[in-house]
Amino acid sequence: MSTSELATSYAALILADDGVDITADKLQSLIKAAKIEEVEPIWTTLFAKALEGKDVKDLLLNVGSGGGAAPLPEALLLRWRAADAAPAAEEKKEEEKEESDEDMGFGLFD
């Protein structure tokens, strides 16, 4: 987030906290009072239009977050459990194959 966006956001929060209507002029005057000079007027206009008619405190209190995951179907859980059990059996089979390859005499130094 740029300095312009941060300054305008903080100014909007200050105005909302005081219960003052958020307008571009009030945002700009608050930013100038804070001696922040690099904020272009477009930012204050955009923020004022975006927050027009909205309760900023209500927006902050109702910030949504990612909800919990949906419960998995039972069939999927059973498939995962079976998949977890299957690799153990496959590992034993692979070890037996490796031993049989060594007995065939394909080594370099035999």
Swiss-Prot record:
Which GO cellular component terms, listed alphabetically, does the Swiss-Prot or TrEMBL entry include?
cytosolic large ribosomal subunit
A GO molecular-function descriptor: protein kinase activator activity
Per its UniProt record, what InterPro entries does this chain match?
P1/P2_N_sf, Ribosomal_P1/P2
Q: Where is this region: Disordered?
A: 87-110
Family annotation (CDD domains): Ribosomal_P1
Q: Which UniProt keywords apply?
A: Allergen, Phosphoprotein, Ribonucleoprotein, Ribosomal protein
- Output one GO BP term: cytoplasmic translation
Q: How is it modified after translation?
A: Phosphorylated.
Q: Which Pfam families match?
A: Ribosomal_60s (PF00428)
Q: What does this protein do?
A: Plays an important role in the elongation step of protein synthesis.
Similarity comment: Belongs to the eukaryotic ribosomal protein P1/P2 family.
How this chain assembles, per its entry, is: P1 and P2 exist as dimers at the large ribosomal subunit.
> What is the protein named?
Large ribosomal subunit protein P1
Organism of origin is: Alternaria alternata (Alternaria rot fungus)
Higher taxonomy? Eukaryota, Fungi, Dikarya, Ascomycota, Pezizomycotina
Supply the gene name: ALTA12
